[in-house]
Every structure is written in C-alpha cells, then in structure tokens.
Swiss-Prot record:
InterPro entries registered for this protein in UniProt: Ribosomal_uL3, Ribosomal_uL3_bac/org-type, Ribosomal_uL3_CS, Transl_B-barrel_sf
PANTHER family assigned: 50S RIBOSOMAL PROTEIN L3 (PTHR11229), LARGE RIBOSOMAL SUBUNIT PROTEIN UL3C (PTHR11229:SF16)
Native species: Gloeothece citriformis (strain PCC 7424)
Family under the similarity heading: Belongs to the universal ribosomal protein uL3 family.
HAMAP family, sorted: Ribosomal_uL3_B
SUPFAM superfamilies linked to this entry: Translation proteins
Assigned keywords, A-Z: Ribonucleoprotein, Ribosomal protein, RNA-binding, rRNA-binding
Gene: rplC
Subunit structure: Part of the 50S ribosomal subunit. Forms a cluster with proteins L14 and L19.
Full protein name: Large ribosomal subunit protein uL3
Ranges for region Disordered: 130-158
An example Gene Ontology molecular-function term: structural constituent of ribosome
Stated role: One of the primary rRNA binding proteins, it binds directly near the 3'-end of the 23S rRNA, where it nucleates assembly of the 50S subunit.
Keyword rRNA-binding: yes
Pfam families, per database record: Ribosomal_L3
Length: 212
C-alpha cells in the first residue's frame, strides 16, 4: 500500500480546460496537513505502517488515552487517526507532515468515505425495483413481490433485497483524476463526485489499480 492523506469534502464546482474550454465538474477537498503520529516497524509491531492525524481540536475534546498517545509524537491534538501500511516505514519520522503535494495534477487516486445516510428506505429507492401499475384497480404500486419459494425452503434466504437502512456505508471510488492542487490553501480538486456530503471525512490514496 501507499501513503495517503485525510481530508474534508467542501463541495463541488466546475473549472474550464484551458485548451478545449470544456467545463470539468470537480470536487474540492481540504486535505492535510496531516502529522505523523506513529511509525510502526517489524521490530516494534510486526509490520510496516505509519499513522497520521487530521482535524485539529482542543485538548478538552479528547480523552486521556488519545492525548497520551499524541504527546509521544509531540503532535497537536487531532480528531481523526488513520493508518497506512507500507513496505518500508523507515523513510518517515514522528512529527513529519503529509501535505497535498503528495499528489500532482493527472494522478489517479482512490477516495474512500461514508455515503450520505438516507434512513429507512423502500424497495424502489434502495434497490431500484420496478414499480407496479398505477392504473385503476391495481393493488400493487410499490410492493416487493415474491420474497421466495413455498414450503421448501420455507424461509427467506439471508441477503434478500428488502426495505431497510439505505446509505451511511463506507465505500471507495477508484481511479479518480486529480485536476488541480493548491498547496497554499491545502486544497485538492478531483474530477467527478466523491462519497458523502460537504464536511464528510475522506481518505485519499494513490490508485491501487491503474489501467483499464
């Protein structure tokens, strides 16, 4: 795996390609700087990784175990911690920062975050089931239809698509393109949409698979 960066979704806008004039929809993400709060090596933990923090808060917002952990790296109090496994963590030191210059325009990235929670939703909204006839006399407008067979097996199989909570799950959108980097304001502009609503916490890493 590769080192990534944590950020917050600010919203969407559009920029124009200087050569073609085509409007490009982009998501603006405020990312970093993320201090390195822990370095793990095979000698200490059995594997290589670094832990980074994001989202400065006051000390009173954190509990004592977390404050004690952060004081070992002399890091400022941060709300979120995230670990990235590496092949070799010797190149990183406690207190170093991960910034948006980790990426450059044209890079492909994977963006992970929590989708917008939509609460308890029905079959059509949650699973795109076909709606029943809306004509006079129809008693099936938004019903699910059959949920299984008869006496055998005599039960509904686990995993059957039914009504329930929709959204609010961790997802990863892969191979998005970095359009622009603003190192002064710690901003990354990524082509297309990313999970969640404005204010959502995101993890941005170099694309795991590159190609078709």
């Amino acid at each position: 795996m590769s080192v990534g960066i944590l950020g917050t979704k600010l919203g969407m806008t559009q920029i124009f390609d200087k050569e073609t004039g085509i409007a490009i929809p982009v998501t603006v993400i405020h990312a970093g700087p993320c201090p390195i709060t822990q370095v793990k090596t095979p000698a200490t933990d059995g594997y290589n990784s670094i832990q980074i923090g994001y989202g400065e808060v006051k000390e009173k917002a954190l509990n004592k175990p977390k404050l004690g952990h952060l004081k070992k790296s002399a890091s400022t109090p941060v709300r979120h911690l995230k670990e990235y496994r590496l092949e070799n963590a010797a190149d990183y030191q406690l207190g170093d920062g991960i910034k948006v210059d980790l990426f450059k325009p044209g890079d492909l990235v994977d963006v992970a975050g929590k989708t917008i929670g939509r609460g308890f939703a029905g079959y059509q909204k949650r699973h795109n089931f076909k709606r029943g006839s809306m004509t006079h006399g129809s008693k099936n407008h938004r019903l699910p239809g059959s949920t299984g067979a008869g006496t055998t097996p005599g039960r509904v199989y686990p995993g059957k698509r039914m009504a329930g909570r929709y959204g609010g799950t961790q997802v990863t959108i892969r191979k998005l393109t970095v359009v622009q980097i603003d190192t002064e304001r710690n901003l990354i502009l990524i082509k297309g949409a990313v999970p969640g609503k404005p204010g959502n916490l995101l993890s941005i890493t170099p694309a795991k698979t590159v190609g078709k």
